[in-house]
Amino acid sequence: MALEQDQQIPRACPVSNAMPPPDDSLTDEPQTRADFLKYYCHLTLDANTAYRELRLSEGNRKAELTDLVQTYPEHPERFSHLFQVLCNEGLSGRCYWEVEFEGSIEIAVAYKDLGRSGYYDECAFGCNDKSWSLDLNKNHKCFRHSDEEVAVPEPRSSRVGVYLDHKAGILTYYCVCDTMLQPMHRVETAFTQLLYPGLWVAGSARLCDPE
């Protein structure tokens, strides 16, 4: 499958307990990367949701779009047409994770009942009311929810940090530049279900270990 970057590319679990925050009594938001890393959560990609041409490796911490159909079994939670994959872990409380990428990527969170069979409205990250997505595609950078877009700045690095405070309804994306975090977009809303981190990958993406 040859990818044409200028063409329209279709965009691309068992419930696990989210990592509890270090101290639920805290009400202030983290300020430094070291503060955010206190809420680091170890995530793994769910092979049962991965699009059939996404290859998972490194203990299901890396996803790469390939030209080959992978040997995944049929599964009702698999994305049928989009280059997407969800994590195994459903998150609540305060959580932080980082993603390093090459090529085009969308870094999302979604409810478990996000659609899986088909293309956009019910399945694509950010095109419905069940998912929120930072889209860093080749010629288009935006945040998307319910198919509404907000432009975001060009990231200065290939690593993005995501901070979730589920109870407070806060979702914030950061560009990670060494020890500095540069805000890219912030959401304040009300989350009603566990949130599953997800990736749409036209290139490669890795869930990072804390450093």
Language-model region placement:
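Beta-rich ligand-recognition domains in immune and ubiquitin systems
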Residues: 1-211
